[in-house]
Amino acid sequence: MIELHQVSKSFNVNGKTVEAVKNVSITVEKGEIFGVVGYSGAGKSTLVRCINLLERPDAGQVVIDGKNLSTLSSKELRVARRKIGMIFQGYNLLKTATVYDNIAKPLKLEGVPKDEIETRVNKYLSIVGLEDKRNNYPSQLSGGQKQRVAIARALAHEPEILLSDEATSALDPETTEAILQLLLKINAELGITIFLITHELDVIQRICDRVAVMENGHLVEQGTVLDIFTKAKHATTKRFVGSEASFDIPQDLLEKYVATGKLVSLHFIGDEADEPALALVSRKFDVLPSILAGGIDHLKNGTLGKLLVHLKGDEVEYSKAISYLKESGVVVEEVELL
């Protein structure tokens, strides 16, 4: 569906060349929700804008449904872009147009018949839950409602792909969750492939099938959401999930625990989240486990239980306890303090 082959993009800033995206290759399957996460300046926004050639890559290929977009004529590219919807952090709504007209006007410009416009606007207002707001103006809407209008506008072109550029970063947690649920609904009911970028791990965790991590324009790691959260390999990825593993407990407090034992992050996947493996550790081995924090995350494709545990005991017993936990299906990782 989406294939990026060694895509690179640079800009000239004050006489200096800045490489925003460097040789990035990603394949996104049809119907998948794929996320890209990274710190500010990692190159995420530039990358997502390369997919519909809002930013034309300096090198590499962007292939959508088998077509290399860079080789298309202007007319062919306009047609191809109709199958790629996009939503942004800033909504980009026309302030003097009603909700209905914000969705309808782009369709009019495309030459869509009036009856078809009416049908589509009503359909997608219903999907985003704003049927009763069709005659309202953007100033009368909340941030979440504005984003829903932007989503309906993107869907009205009936795309096969929806690009999301930090679409939830300006929203409060409750509204963010509502928008994420809407994106899941769109993916499930309409079969639309979603490619999103974010700096929020919660967004990746809640709705993505797979994720890529970017740093300084490079793609440094990619895999399933479960693998990234439990088996991170690159230092940048570990920094991202590190705050999750330590539950944002203050560094000075963690240092006190490290001085008297080992801090380990335990992940229980799926049905194993209910298994009493940790409870049996102190009975089988001469170690004293203390649970410092814990929780259960609901991923798109399963459940992930996580605990931050202080294990006190000598090295031999500690090693035996860790081996036992791993044999019980628990993903174990020592917490490294920054």
UniProtKB/Swiss-Prot annotation:
SUPFAM superfamilies tied to this protein: ACT-like, P-loop containing nucleoside triphosphate hydrolases
This protein's UniProt keywords: Amino-acid transport, ATP-binding, Cell membrane, Membrane, Nucleotide-binding, Translocase, Transport
Binding annotation for ATP: G38, Y39, S40, G41, A42, G43, K44, S45
Where is the protein situated, by its record's location annotation?
A: Cell membrane
> Residues of the signal sequence?
none
Q: Which InterPro entries match?
A: AAA+_ATPase, ABC_transporter-like_ATP-bd, ABC_transporter-like_CS, ACT-like_dom_sf, MetN_ABC, MetN_ABC_transporter-like, NIL_domain, P-loop_NTPase
The Enzyme Commission number assigned here is 7.4.2.11
Reaction equation(s) it catalyzes: L-methionine(out) + ATP + H2O = L-methionine(in) + ADP + phosphate + H(+); D-methionine(out) + ATP + H2O = D-methionine(in) + ADP + phosphate + H(+)
Provide a Gene Ontology MF annotation, just one.
ATP hydrolysis activity
Q: Per UniProt, what is the membrane topology? A: Peripheral membrane protein
Cellular component GO terms, alphabetically?
plasma membrane
What's the top EC group for this one? Answer: translocase
Q: What are the residue boundaries of the ABC transporter domain, all occurrences included?
A: 2-241
Tell me the superkingdom of the source. Bacteria
Task: State its role.
Answer: Part of the ABC transporter complex MetNIQ involved in methionine import. Responsible for energy coupling to the transport system.
The entry assigns this protein to a family as follows: Belongs to the ABC transporter superfamily. Methionine importer (TC 3.A.1.24) family.
> Quaternary form?
The complex is composed of two ATP-binding proteins (MetN), two transmembrane proteins (MetI) and a solute-binding protein (MetQ).
Protein name (record): Methionine import ATP-binding protein MetN 1
Protein source organism: Listeria monocytogenes serotype 4b (strain F2365)
Q: What is the lineage of its organism?
A: Bacteria, Bacillati, Bacillota, Bacilli, Bacillales
Q: What gene is behind this protein?
A: metN1
